[in-house]
UniProtKB/Swiss-Prot annotation:
Homodimer; disulfide-linked. Heterodimer with KCNK2; disulfide-linked. In astrocytes, forms mostly heterodimeric potassium channels with KCNK2, with only a minor proportion of functional channels containing homodimeric KCNK1. Interacts with KCNK3 and KCNK9, forming functional heterodimeric channels. Interacts with GNG4. Identified in a complex with PSD and ARF6; interacts only with PSD that is bound to ARF6. Interacts with UBE2I. GO terms for cellular component: apical plasma membrane; brush border membrane; dendrite; endosome; inward rectifier potassium channel complex; membrane; perikaryon; plasma membrane. The modification Phosphoserine is found at S326. It is a multi-pass membrane protein. Ion channel that contributes to passive transmembrane potassium transport and to the regulation of the resting membrane potential in brain astrocytes, but also in kidney and in other tissues. Forms dimeric channels through which potassium ions pass in accordance with their electrochemical gradient. The channel is selective for K(+) ions at physiological potassium concentrations and at neutral pH, but becomes permeable to Na(+) at subphysiological K(+) levels and upon acidification of the extracellular medium. GO terms for biological process: cellular response to acidic pH; chloride transmembrane transport; glutamate secretion; potassium ion transmembrane transport; regulation of resting membrane potential; response to nicotine; sodium ion transmembrane transport. The gene is Kcnk1. Belongs to the two pore domain potassium channel (TC 1.A.1.8) family. It comes from Rattus norvegicus. The chain crosses the membrane at residues 21-41, 133-156, 182-202, 244-267. This is Potassium channel subfamily K member 1.
Length: 336
């Protein structure tokens, strides 16, 4: 009997602190995922780094042997200056010095990468004034960009996600959850095709040194705002229509980021994912826990603004696709 009482008390203890246990496992899983990534990257990339270091040492030794009039400290000083300039986007190579980094189109591309926090790092401000302006520009521009993306994604989601799902639910009587899942998968497939596969094929043709994998890698690194900077389009020697090309890339990155956020918002609104997310939230038991800045169920871009604002109030009996927090849609909008 004591064992049964102890077992039941343990079960009650686990159930009472279920959210804390789930959160603990979430933190542990994230840390393990970080360690897993570090182990894989280290095991894959470290041998290549070692080979490259050996190759550079051999080239340096051979160069000094062929040019005995040049001392090693002089060569080190020259290479250090070249590498320092390269870090600022200026190359000493004759076939790479024809493109300016701070003409208008290049500056426009740089501004877009700063505001979207992609930041390839291939071009950086050279002057103290440019660095100071970059700080001020980013402090104002990044929140402005978040507000802009929030408004755009909210409006696009209404027309691209909620109204189509509501249309099939009301007009054809399909289950809303099933329609939402199918719609999210189709939307993800279309987005990947239009903003990853097709642009990757285009970049592999326009960029001389890029294959399809490298082009796809650039698209993913850019639209996920990782922006490593190892691949930057439009930097080739004598790039044709470089100004127009840079403007097109800027538009592609902006539209692609919006598309990615719309897909993310669509998946976040799925009922199953909402239930899964709530497993890691703090359970609101007390009245003071109810007062907070952001609702737990509103960790998405479209939740910052009102959902589907301006729709008629007499259609409240039509349940929206998201949750009860979003105002219902018009019947007329679903029949378009």
């Amino acid at each position: 009997m004591l064992q049964s009482l102890a077992g039941s008390s343990c079960v009650r203890l686990v159930e009472r602190h279920r959210s804390a246990w789930c959160f603990g496992f979430l933190v542990l899983g994230y840390l393990l995922y970080l360690v897993f990534g570090a182990v894989v990257f280290s095991s894959v990339e470290l041998p290549y780094e070692d080979l490259l270091r050996q190759e550079l040492r051999k080239l340096k030794r051979r160069f000094l042997e062929e040019h005995e009039c040049l001392s090693e400290p002089q060569l080190e000083q020259f290479l250090g200056r070249v590498l320092e300039a390269s870090n600022y986007g200026v190359s000493v190579l004759s076939n790479a010095s024809g493109n300016w980094n701070w003409d208008f189109t290049s500056a426009l591309f740089f501004a877009s990468t700063v505001l979207s926090t992609t930041g390839y790092g291939h071009t950086v401000p050279l002057s103290d004034g440019g660095k100071a302006f970059c700080i001020i520009y980013s402090v104002i521009g990044i929140p402005f960009t978040l507000l802009f993306l929030t408004a755009v994604v909210q409006r696009v989601t209404v027309h691209v996600t909620r109204r189509p799902v509501l249309y099939f639910h009301i007009r054809w009587g399909f289950s809303k959850q099933v329609v939402a899942i199918v719609h999210a998968v189709l939307l993800g497939f279309v987005t990947v095709s239009c903003f990853f596969f097709i642009p990757a094929a285009v970049f592999s043709v326009l960029e001389d040194d890029w294959n399809f994998l490298e082009s796809f890698y650039f698209c993913f690194i850019s639209l996920s705002t990782i922006g490593l900077g190892d691949y930057v389009p439009g930097e080739g020697y004598n790039q044709k229509f470089r100004e127009l090309y840079k403007i097109g890339i800027t538009c592609y990155l902006l539209l692609g980021l919006i598309a990615m956020l719309v897909v993310l918002e669509t998946f976040c609104e799925l009922h199953e994912l909402k239930k899964f997310r709530k497993m890691f939230y703090v359970k609101k038991d007390k009245d003071e826990d109810q007062v907070h800045i952001m609702e737990h169920d509103q960790l998405s871009f479209s939740s910052i603004t009102e959902q589907a604002a301006g729709l008629k109030e007499e259609q409240k009996q039509n349940e929206p696709f998201v949750a009860s927090q979003s105002p219902p849609y018009e019947d007329g909008s679903a029949n378009h």
